[in-house]
Amino acid sequence: MKLSLVISTSDAAFDALAFKGDLRKGMELAKRVGYQAVEIAVRDPSIVDWNEVKILSEELNLPICAIGTGQAYLADGLSLTHPNDEIRKKAIERVVKHTEVAGMFGALVIIGLVRGRREGRSYEETEELFIESMKRLLELTEHAKFVIEPLNRYETDFINTIDDALRILRKINSNRVGILADTFHMNIEEVNIPESLKRAGEKLYHFHVADSNRWAPGCGHFDFRSVFNTLKEIGYNRYVSVECLPLPGGMEEAAEIAFKTLKELIIKLT
């Protein structure tokens, strides 16, 4: 397992980011602390000079493992299940832009809040629109890989658990789509986290960590030892990305505490 830090472009509105703002500063922080990659949350890829980011990534020898898309929903109201056809089309077009960036770095594209909410519609109707949009994204992108992130009920009422995501994956039926599991959301929604991760198995393509209070891992009461033992058991050897509030003590301290906590867990697994 390799450790990554979630950072963002300066226009991010999402609070649960250890580092928000200048990408260079975020990437330099990640490298200095010891992270092996960064994950970048970005609202609109067209406003970032990705050639400069690529140069910086190579300069720091710091890969970009995933691209977050949720700001397109939070800031611009774009979603893959929006009842308005034109807005849904714009959401697909925006995510295609994210895939183009991801292709520059061999990164995953995260489908979190950009999938939207039910907004009074049935689960089945929302799911049908989502599957239609995901299949369209697969048609429009030749090599892009996506991960669907189950989110807790307070953020969305659509795809809250790993089982919800697995059911949709079976209907999409593509090895280019997997699951992103997040300890913060699982702590709210899953009945038995280790068993849920075992059901995800080889479809688990990415992993987010924050403690029970969404602070840095090590600052709450989440049982990381049990979860990391399960990750080892299912053969998970991909990235573990820290996506937490800049607490305690600000962005740098949160990044440092998280890294120390997780590194010790990984060492004990070997």
Curated annotation (Swiss-Prot):
InterPro entries: Hyi_epimerase/isomerase, Sugar_Epim/Isomerase, Xyl_isomerase-like_sf, Xyl_isomerase-like_TIM-brl. Binds 1 divalent metal cation per subunit. Mn(2+) is the most efficient metal cofactor, but can also use other divalent metal cations such as Ni(2+), Mg(2+), and, to a lesser extent, Co(2+) and Zn(2+), but not Ca(2+), Cu(2+), and Fe(2+). One of its GO terms (biological process) is inositol metabolic process. Signal peptide: none annotated. Optimum pH is 6.5-7.0 with L-ribulose as substrate. Keywords: Carbohydrate metabolism, Isomerase, Manganese, Metal-binding. It catalyses: 5-dehydro-L-gluconate = keto-D-tagaturonate; L-ribulose = L-xylulose; D-ribulose = D-xylulose; keto-D-tagatose = keto-D-sorbose. Optimum temperature is about 80 degrees Celsius with L-ribulose as substrate. Is hyperthermostable, with an apparent melting temperature (Tm) of 102.4 degrees Celsius. Homodimer. NCBIfam families: keto_glucon_epim_IolO. This is 5-keto-L-gluconate epimerase. It comes from Thermotoga maritima (strain ATCC 43589 / DSM 3109 / JCM 10099 / NBRC 100826 / MSB8). The gene is iolO.
